[in-house]
Amino acid sequence: MKNYSKDPDRQYHIQVAKGEVGRYVIMPGDPKRCVKIAQYLDNPVLIADNREFITYTGTLDGVKVSVTSTGIGGPSASIAMEELYRCGADTFVRIGTCGGMQTDVKSGDIVIATGAIRMEGTSKEYAPIEFPAVADLDVTNALVAAAKQKNFTHHTGVVQCKDAFYGQHEPEKMPAGYELINKWNAWKMLGCLASEMESAALFVVAAKLGVRAGSCFLVVANQEREKLGLENPVVLDTDMAVQVAVSAVRNLIREDCAGE
């Protein structure tokens, strides 16, 4: 593991310095996914490996692009975004997994978030709860275009963000289970597509920093389909979501260059 703790030019957590990352960053949660995503870049180089944060930098169509893992949840994701921003990044694409909430959101589908329910704690330390967690329109459109280009089954809409994974999957065992179940049912009635753990924080932090952020996910499974006895295989291969994220960054590079 690289250790730059004595270098004041490097960000404390991600251990990256200015000039080592591109303006475009793909952000998986799982550090192990960084290698997989970096393989889609030209000439990827390992920049840093510290805690849950691994960073690679390469190029797409001749433009510097980076991949940085965030770990699980809003606190570490917000740290990664803050420190990457200080190193020059301004466009962030979160890629990860989610659980479907609507019965038509099936295992293996792609979900692209337009906004996120702020049922987590990190964003509340950035903005009052009345402020919406909304994805950047340019990034969202690039993700949708990429999913269409790949002909992948995809859904676009609101996702729910929480801090407790097992609060979602075993609410009846929680002292706050009554509230968790009632809110879950409310989110379903409102058409929420899926549940995950980072987007609300990233969207609000991006708003505070004045940068662009969007999210796309692989649907691993759908507990609502399970409850109804519907087909619900577990799908763990994130390659389709990775392809969407990489193609979306290509779309953004092309659009940004055309607008200069």
Identify the residue ranges that each predicted region occupies.
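Conserved active-site and cofactor/substrate-binding residues in soluble primary-metabolism enzymes
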Residues: 29-32, 72-79, 87, 105, ...
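Active-site rim beta-loop-alpha module in soluble metabolic enzymes
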Residues: 133-191
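Short acidic/polar active-site loop segments enriched in Thr and Asp
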Residues: 90-91, 193, 212
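Metabolite-binding pocket within alpha/beta catalytic cores that recognizes anionic/polar moieties
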Residues: 1-142
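His/Asp/Glu-rich mid-to-C-terminal helical/loop segments that flank catalytic regions of hydrolases
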Residues: 223-260
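Generic non-transmembrane alpha-helical segments
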Residues: 142-150, 205, 244-255
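Flexible, glycine/charged-enriched surface loops at secondary-structure junctions
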Residues: 44-49, 151-158, 254-260
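Zn-dependent metallopeptidase/amidohydrolase metal-coordination segment
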Residues: 200-233
